[in-house]
Each structure stands twice: as structure tokens, then as C-alpha cells.
From Swiss-Prot:
Protein name (Swiss-Prot/TrEMBL): Small ribosomal subunit protein bS18
UniProt GO MF annotations: small ribosomal subunit rRNA binding; structural constituent of ribosome
Any GO BP: translation
Matching Gene3D superfamilies: Ribosomal protein S18 (4.10.640.10)
Family assignment from sequence similarity: Belongs to the bacterial ribosomal protein bS18 family.
Organism: Kineococcus radiotolerans (strain ATCC BAA-149 / DSM 14245 / SRS30216)
Gene giving rise to this polypeptide: rpsR
Length: 78
């Protein structure tokens, strides 16, 4: 029996580096919405393709934007 070749998953491109964004700002809601699911949850690193440090910045910016009422805490899924 021959072994089935295992494919390595393709590395996701970093969306922040592609858009040439150095700092994540809580006032940039258009950018932050890309990292929020349709249910209003913050998307995981493995889904978005950002680094650990950038994921922390994004999470902090989303939480600040929610506090300032720029983003909803949850979406109207129902």
C-alpha cells in the first residue's frame, strides 16, 4: 500500500501587511469589522492570518471600539 501524500495547509497572507497598516486604531471600524464574525465574535488568528502581537492589538482595539459604541457587542443575528 502506497502512502497518501500529505499536503501542508497554505499559509494565509497577513491582511494588515497586505494593506500596509502598521498600527491598529480603534476608530478604524471598517478595518476592525474584517476581524469580527457575523455573530459579533473576534475571529481567531488561524482564521485571519495575523501574528500574535497583531491579534492582541486587534482584540484590544475591538474592545475599545465596543466601549466607545463604535462597534456593537453582538450583531443582530436573530
Amino acid at each position: 500500500m502506497a502512502k497518501v501524500p500529505v499536503r501542508k495547509p497554505k499559509k494565509k497572507q497577513n491582511p494588515l501587511k497586505a494593506a500596509k497598516i502598521e498600527a491598529v486604531d480603534y476608530k478604524d471600524t471598517a478595518l476592525l469589522r474584517k476581524f469580527i464574525s457575523d455573530r459579533g465574535k473576534i475571529r481567531a488568528r488561524r482564521v485571519t492570518g495575523v501574528s500574535v502581537q497583531e491579534q492582541r492589538q486587534i482584540a484590544k482595539a475591538i474592545k475599545n471600539a465596543r466601549e466607545m459604541a463604535l462597534l456593537p457587542y453582538s450583531s443582530s443575528a436573530r
